[in-house]
């Protein structure tokens, strides 16, 4: 078993009381759990623990519109995906002295620090004398040349720790000619051999654009991506999961499990829990598989079935009524953050409101409503008053409705309450309904990474280092065979262009890495669908408890990944 070695101080002693310079992290004031994680050994795939070589696969294509992707990436399109394989020839080029940069891009996800640690340790082991720069504050740090030189002492307090505060992240993009020029100047100034971009689909799209730009300018700087997002929507056959998803789902599942026990204890509340996931519903689906709630809404299914908001409300109300017949006046309902974006009629209403409010003032008499189509007017009148006001009053700087600020869980509580009141009047429901709302979001982004995420991220970083040393660019670090023991994991790089499609924006084709949505024919959804009726009417609640770092379930992997890999979870 190849294992990570702990970073040492110059005197050979562990940096247990070291403050990471300029960041404020003191390992000396960590909790016992945090300190135990600092020294947690990280096994590596066996291919990374012995001499290896990088082998090219066949030429790659694109996820969609290959002819357009080829035009947008003339230097990179078609390059092969690569694999690391053992090499006993003795020809492996070691101890190159490299200058490598790393940048965190986008929202936080547990495990990011271990990606950085993996890159650093690879350089320390295989490229002695190399320098690693951490760009501060995300892509803006690359453009402005703001960085810190990473050292063993600097990195040590962050090993196996949550957060992105080692160098911090940002949501800036390198996309205009001026911004590309700034990035070029930084790369030249630091004489960078490589740059690792740790981010989600947008960030890795930008990483590919940067790799194309550097190659077209004959810069030696190579660019490698690493797949990050708790939403779980950056994945493919070659990139089985994005890091952070495993940890975030386990954190949310613990909280949901606690709420379930509370619901059962009081016997009088329905808990409506909104979960992160602006686009795909992967987090909601995984948390359902881990906890067995009474109702779980999956945005992709709502869209596929063309369900209306009234349909969704009626479905929840039906479950509430049926449970009341069994004496259960409580329950737990999971809602994906992006639910509204999957309901076509809501999108139509928002589009009409944006158009009307761009030219008219909302009058108290409601004359403006006459400009809504009959279907949208009916939907608007169906919404709770608080949501109506939110749609009309809370606008972004462009005057558009701020959909992300709509508290879907509170909206559904009010709509279900109204529906149940109507059923009471008809004698179809005679119990009491009380709703409690929750949003579990930021709580999951910076937790201590699970054993899986800690190890997976370390391997991603180590793999990224190997790809850069091998002269590769425009790839995303890929670690596979994740259902097997760590030693049997595969390591390689997937062509970023192979993950891309195009969208038409402002009359031009723009490259995008396609988000991986919940597949209704996929194994995770099918397993959920086969169980949900039983979960709805009975109490099959599971409280998984906190993330375990030792013991029989410490290395357990999330259901979604195992089911997608063909392993029964």
Swiss-Prot record:
Catalytic activity of the protein: beta-D-fructose 6-phosphate + diphosphate = beta-D-fructose 1,6-bisphosphate + phosphate + H(+)
UniProt-recorded Gene Ontology molecular function terms: 6-phosphofructokinase activity; ATP binding; diphosphate-fructose-6-phosphate 1-phosphotransferase activity; metal ion binding
Cell location: Cytoplasm
Activity control, per UniProt: Allosterically activated by fructose 2,6-bisphosphate.
Listed pathway(s): Carbohydrate degradation; glycolysis; D-glyceraldehyde 3-phosphate and glycerone phosphate from D-glucose: step 3/4
Site (Important for catalytic activity): 228
Gene3D superfamilies: 3.40.50.450, Phosphofructokinase domain, Phosphofructokinase, domain 3
Residues bound to Mg(2+): 201
Pfam families with a match to the protein in the record: PFK
Active-site annotation: 231 (proton acceptor)
Gene Ontology terms describing biological process: fructose 6-phosphate metabolic process; photosynthesis; response to glucose
InterPro entries reported for this sequence: ATP_PFK (IPR022953), PfpB_PPi_PFK (IPR011183), Phosphofructokinase_dom (IPR000023), PKF_sf (IPR035966)
GO cellular component annotations of the record: cytoplasm
Binding site for substrate: 229-231, 268-269, 276-278, 337, 442-445
Keyword Transmembrane helix found: no
Entry's EC annotation: 2.7.1.90
Principal subcellular localisation of the protein: cytoplasm
UniProtKB keywords: Allosteric enzyme, Cytoplasm, Glycolysis, Kinase, Magnesium, Metal-binding, Transferase
Keyword DNA-binding applies: no
Family annotation (HAMAP family): Phosphofructokinase_II_Long
Listed name of the protein: Pyrophosphate--fructose 6-phosphate 1-phosphotransferase subunit beta
Biological source species: Solanum tuberosum
Gene: PFP-BETA
């Amino acid at each position: 078993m190849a294992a990570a070695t702990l970073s040492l101080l110059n005197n050979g002693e562990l940096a247990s009381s070291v403050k990471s310079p300029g960041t404020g992290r003191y390992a000396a004031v960590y909790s016992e759990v945090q300190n135990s994680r600092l020294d947690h050994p990280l096994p590596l795939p066996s291919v990374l623990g012995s001499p290896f070589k990088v082998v090219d696969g066949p030429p790659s294509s694109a996820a969609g519109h290959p002819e357009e992707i080829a035009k947008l990436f003339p230097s990179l399109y078609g390059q092969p995906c690569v694999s690391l394989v053992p090499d006993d020839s003795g020809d492996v080029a070691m101890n190159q002295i490299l200058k490598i940069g790393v940048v965190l891009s986008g929202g936080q996800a547990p495990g990011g620090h271990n990606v950085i640690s993996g890159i650093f340790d690879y350089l320390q082991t295989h490229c002695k004398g190399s320098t690693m720069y951490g760009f501060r504050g995300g892509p803006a740090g690359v453009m402005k040349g703001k960085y810190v030189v990473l050292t063993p002492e600097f990195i040590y307090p962050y090993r196996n720790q949550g957060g992105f505060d080692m160098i911090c992240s940002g949501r800036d993009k390198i996309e205009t000619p001026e911004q590309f020029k700034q990035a070029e100047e930084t790369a030249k100034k630091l004489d960078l051999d490589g740059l690792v971009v740790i981010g989600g689909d947008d960030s890795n799209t930008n990483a590919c654009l940067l790799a194309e730009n550097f190659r077209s300018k004959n810069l030696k700087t190579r660019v490698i991506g690493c797949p990050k997002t708790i939403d779980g929507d950056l994945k493919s056959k070659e990139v089985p999961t994005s890091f952070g998803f495993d940890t975030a789902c386990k954190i949310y599942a613990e909280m949901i499990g606690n709420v379930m026990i509370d619901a059962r204890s009081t016997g009088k509340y329905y808990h409506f829990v909104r979960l992160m996931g602006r686009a795909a519903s992967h987090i909601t689906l995984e948390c359902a598989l881990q906890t067995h709630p009474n109702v779980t809404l999956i945005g992709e299914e709502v869209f596929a079935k063309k369900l209306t908001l009234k349909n969704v409300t009626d479905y929840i109300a039906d479950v509430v009524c049926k449970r009341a017949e069994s004496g259960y006046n409580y329950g737990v309902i999971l809602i994906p953050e992006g639910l509204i974006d999957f309901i076509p009629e809501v999108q139509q209403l928002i589009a009409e409101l944006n158009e009307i409010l761009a030219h008219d003032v909302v009058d108290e008499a409601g004359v403006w409503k006459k400009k809504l189509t009959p279907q949208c007017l009916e939907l608007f009148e169906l919404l709770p008053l608080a949501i109506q006001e939110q749609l009309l009053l809370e606008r972004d700087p462009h005057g558009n409705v701020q959909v992300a600020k709509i508290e879907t869980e509170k909206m559904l509580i009010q709509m279900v309450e109204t529906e149940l009141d109507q059923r009471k009047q008809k004698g179809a429901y005679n119990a009491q309904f009380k709703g409690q709302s929750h949003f579990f979001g930021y709580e999951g982004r910076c937790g201590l990474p699970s054993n899986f995420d800690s190890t997976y991220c370390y391997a991603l970083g180590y793999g990224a280092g190997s790809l850069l040393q091998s002269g590769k660019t425009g790839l995303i670090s890929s670690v596979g065979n994740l259902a097997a023991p760590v030693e049997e994991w595969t390591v390689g790089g997937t062509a970023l262009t192979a993950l891309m499609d195009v969208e038409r924006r402002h009359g031009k084709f723009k490259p995008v890495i396609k988000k991986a949505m919940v597949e209704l024919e996929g194994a995770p959804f099918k397993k959920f669908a086969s169980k949900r009726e039983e979960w709805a009417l009975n109490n099959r609640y599971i409280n998984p408890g906190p993330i375990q770092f030792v013991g029989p379930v410490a290395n357990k992997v999330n259901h979604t990944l195992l089911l997608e890999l063909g392993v029964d979870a």
